[in-house]
Amino acid sequence: MIQMQTNLDVADNSGARRVMCIKVLGGAKRRYAGVGDKIVVSVKEAIPRGRVKKGDVLQAIVVRTSQGIKRKDGSVIRFDKNAAVIVNKQSEPIGTRIFGPVPRELRAKNHMKIISLAPEVL
């Protein structure tokens, strides 16, 4: 569950390391974002010579949450940290690689490019 002011790790090679959620997209009074939801983020920490720099305001897709995801069979998938992938306006990843596992629920939200780049789909 991601809300405003939540800090997230970046799970791609766009150049950002840490971002902070400044808005949850998808409704006027929407408060929380889960896996597969689009958020607006501000870059808080970036590497030198990356595609993005500190202070940039971008869109991102949440790929991992520490709260977890409940599945139909009753199982719950939790991750150690919250993570997101930086995307452009067409929801395509800016980076060319994705680090760490991503959940299968991204497929239902039509983020196929993220799933194809991920090393492991849980």
Swiss-Prot record:
InterPro entries, alphabetized: Ribosomal_uL14, Ribosomal_uL14_bac-type, Ribosomal_uL14_CS, Ribosomal_uL14_sf
Gene3D superfamilies the UniProt entry points to: Ribosomal protein L14
Cited SUPFAM superfamilies: Ribosomal protein L14 (SSF50193)
Alphabetized UniProt keyword annotations: Ribonucleoprotein, Ribosomal protein, RNA-binding, rRNA-binding
Keyword set includes rRNA-binding: yes
Gene Ontology biological process terms from the UniProt entry: translation
GO molecular function ontology, one term from the record: large ribosomal subunit rRNA binding
The protein's assembly and partners: Part of the 50S ribosomal subunit. Forms a cluster with proteins L3 and L19. In the 70S ribosome, L14 and L19 interact and together make contacts with the 16S rRNA in bridges B5 and B8.
Functional summary from the UniProt entry: Binds to 23S rRNA. Forms part of two intersubunit bridges in the 70S ribosome.
Family the UniProt entry places it in: Belongs to the universal ribosomal protein uL14 family.
Name recorded for this polypeptide: Large ribosomal subunit protein uL14
Species, as recorded: Phenylobacterium zucineum (strain HLK1)
Gene (UniProt): rplN
